[in-house]
Amino acid sequence: MTNIRKTHPLFKIINHTFIDLPTPSNISTWWNFGSLLGMCLIMQILTGLFLAMHYTPDTTTAFSSVTHICRDVNYGWIIRYLHTNGASMFFICLYLHIGRSMYYGSYTYLKTWNIGIMLLFTVMATAFMGYVLPWGQMSFWGATVITNLLSAIPYIGTNLVEWIWGGFSVDKATLTRFFTLHFILPFIITALTMTHLLFLHETGSNNPLGISPDSDKIPFHPYYTMKDILGLLPMIFIMMALALFYPDLLGDPDNYTPANPLNTPPHIKPEWYFLFAYAILRSIPNKLGGVMALVLSILILAILPMLHTAKQRSLMFRPISQCLFWMLMTNLLVLTWIGGQPVEHPFTIIGQLASISYFSIILILMPMAGLIENNLMKW
């Protein structure tokens, strides 16, 4: 008798995706982050669902409803801290996942890569709107500053901002629509994730060597299911350590003060995972220029396949490109640090230099290194 997982219409899809999927035998731990992101998404949806049961999207009660969740709801505090720190873990896994794809040349799978960029934008939008919901000082002012950036768009900017706000300032209408969108977007992310997987399984996974793995493939289960579970354990450990011992380590103390439109915090800054883009935004003195640089800092990922000049796909045997890649990673850490600092000397000049080097490494130096390495191979 044929196994039910190979004949049943529904189980057959699961079987081809997670059990009998032919996978390259040499993929490393860097390929674990896809499954970790899936687990983060499931956890965010579950914790978010329980938080939404007790949260009220109203300017007068939003802050106190979050306090009520932490104080009065059974295990409300752990649900809330798992959700906030879960977002941080989500972005850590997301950035490592993108970094791995850049290092090993996975962006050559165009459909998968483009869906991935759409996923990144959607996750960023969801996280931003989630940060507004507790209605603390940083929530309110973060929402005001970031949405106000759209006013830099010529002609329609001001109208667009007021349309998003639902009035002439960030108020009840803004909070209600942000809550609605924050609730619905994770389900859109889930649909996009399924599309991402669908396109990935059309081509098969990449591998560290960047060559065709067709000659040596193994079934996904049990080999990679075990490997993914092994990767899941440290992630759960870090997450629980954050939620139980250092729940506010990655947050902002200003968000424990209720939102006050009459009192501006000394330093308005977003969550740590947006600081690199925020630093690029601030490094340009012109408003429209800053907004364009902010969008391009992430949208630049879409043109990576066009900038690939090397004959080899992976950076594994390309020392010059490797050096540039790690310079880019260090540069991103510098930008993240600068994004959290006040706008004063020497931070402004460091931010401007880091922003210039960020774009030059990706747009000029990496393609040049690829061409140099092509010529070196002829020697």
Curated annotation (Swiss-Prot):
Gene3D superfamilies: Cytochrome Bc1 Complex, Chain C. The keyword Secreted does not apply. This is Cytochrome b. One of its GO terms (biological process) is mitochondrial electron transport, ubiquinol to cytochrome c. Heme b b562 binds at H83, H182. Binds 2 heme b groups non-covalently. The keyword rRNA processing does not apply. It comes from Choloepus didactylus. Component of the ubiquinol-cytochrome c reductase complex (complex III or cytochrome b-c1 complex) that is part of the mitochondrial respiratory chain. The b-c1 complex mediates electron transfer from ubiquinol to cytochrome c. Contributes to the generation of a proton gradient across the mitochondrial membrane that is then used for ATP synthesis. Keywords: Electron transport, Heme, Iron, Membrane, Metal-binding, Mitochondrion, Mitochondrion inner membrane, Respiratory chain, Transmembrane, Transmembrane helix, Transport, Ubiquinone. Its cofactor is heme b. Heme b b566 binds at H97, H196. Pfam families: Cytochrom_B_C, Cytochrome_B. It is found in: Mitochondrion inner membrane. Heme 1 (or BL or b562) is low-potential and absorbs at about 562 nm, and heme 2 (or BH or b566) is high-potential and absorbs at about 566 nm. The cytochrome bc1 complex contains 11 subunits: 3 respiratory subunits (MT-CYB, CYC1 and UQCRFS1), 2 core proteins (UQCRC1 and UQCRC2) and 6 low-molecular weight proteins (UQCRH/QCR6, UQCRB/QCR7, UQCRQ/QCR8, UQCR10/QCR9, UQCR11/QCR10 and a cleavage product of UQCRFS1). This cytochrome bc1 complex then forms a dimer. InterPro entries: Cyt_b/b6_C, Cyt_b/b6_C_sf, Cyt_b/b6_N, Cytb/b6-like_sf, Cytochrome_b, Cytochrome_b_C_euk/bac, Cytochrome_b_N_euk/bac, Di-haem_cyt_TM. The chain crosses the membrane at residues 33-53, 77-98, 113-133, 178-198, 226-246, 288-308, 320-340, 347-367. A ubiquinone binds at H201. It comes from the Eukaryota. GO terms for molecular function: metal ion binding; ubiquinol-cytochrome-c reductase activity. PROSITE patterns: CYTB_CTER, CYTB_NTER. GO terms for cellular component: mitochondrial inner membrane; respiratory chain complex III.
